[in-house]
C-alpha cells in the first residue's frame, strides 16, 4: 500500500516495518481506535461523541458529521454499522464517490482512515487561515498546493520573512499548535 510494493520488499518485511512503526507510535494507534469507537457510537446511539481538541462526531438525519476544531464539518452520508468479515468486528460504511471510478457506492472506513481525514482537513483549515491573513495583508495568492502558497508580487515588495511570520501566527481555534513556515523567492 501507498507505494510500498515498489520498494522490492516482501510482504513479511512490510508487515515487520508496519508493526515496528505501530509499536513505536502507541498514541497514534490508540487514536485510531478512539476515533473508530467514537464514530460507531455516534451512529449507534444517534448522539454527539466528543474526542480530543474539539473533534466531535454527531449523527443527524442520516448523516454522520465530524466537526473539526475549526468548526468546519465533514459529512459521511447514510452511515451504517456492518460486520467486517475479514476482521469479524463491527465497522462503519457510508455512501460516497469511489476514488478511482467516481461511481457513487457504499464505502468502508475505519479509525485510521478517519484520522487521516481529520489530519488532512485540519491541515487544510490551517492553510486557509494563513491564506486569509496573507490576503488581508495585501499579498496576492495565485495558487496553493497542499501546504504551500504561491504569491506573486513585485520584487521590491516581497518580504519573505513577513510572509513566513504571517503564515506561522497562531490560530484561535488551535491554541498551542506551533506553526512555522519557510519559503523562497524566484523570478
Task: Indicate where each model-derived feature is located.
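Conserved catalytic core of nucleotide polymerization and phosphodiester-bond processing enzymes
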Residues: 1-187
Amino acid at each position: 500500500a501507498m507505494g510500498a510494493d515498489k520498494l522490492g520488499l516482501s510482504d513479511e518485511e512490510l508487515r515487520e516495518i508496519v508493526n515496528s512503526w505501530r509499536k513505536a507510535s502507541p498514541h497514534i494507534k490508540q487514536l485510531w481506535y478512539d476515533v473508530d469507537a467514537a464514530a460507531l457510537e455516534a451512529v449507534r446511539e444517534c448522539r454527539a461523541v466528543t474526542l480530543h481538541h474539539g473533534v466531535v462526531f454527531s449523527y443527524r438525519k442520516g448523516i454522520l458529521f465530524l466537526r473539526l476544531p475549526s468548526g468546519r464539518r465533514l459529512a459521511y452520508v447514510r452511515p451504517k454499522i456492518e460486520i467486517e468479515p475479514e476482521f469479524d468486528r463491527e465497522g462503519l460504511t457510508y455512501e460516497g464517490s469511489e476514488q478511482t471510478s467516481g461511481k457513487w457506492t457504499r464505502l468502508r472506513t475505519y479509525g485510521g482512515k478517519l484520522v487521516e481525514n481529520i489530519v488532512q482537513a485540519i491541515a487544510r483549515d490551517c492553510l486557509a487561515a494563513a491564506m486569509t491573513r496573507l490576503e488581508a495583508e495585501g499579498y496576492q495568492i495565485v495558487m496553493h498546493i497542499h501546504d504551500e502558497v504561491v504569491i506573486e508580487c513585485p520584487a521590491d515588495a516581497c518580504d519573505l520573512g513577513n510572509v513566513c511570520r504571517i503564515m506561522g501566527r497562531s490560530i484561535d481555534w488551535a491554541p498551542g499548535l506551533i506553526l512555522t513556515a519557510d519559503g523562497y523567492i524566484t523570478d
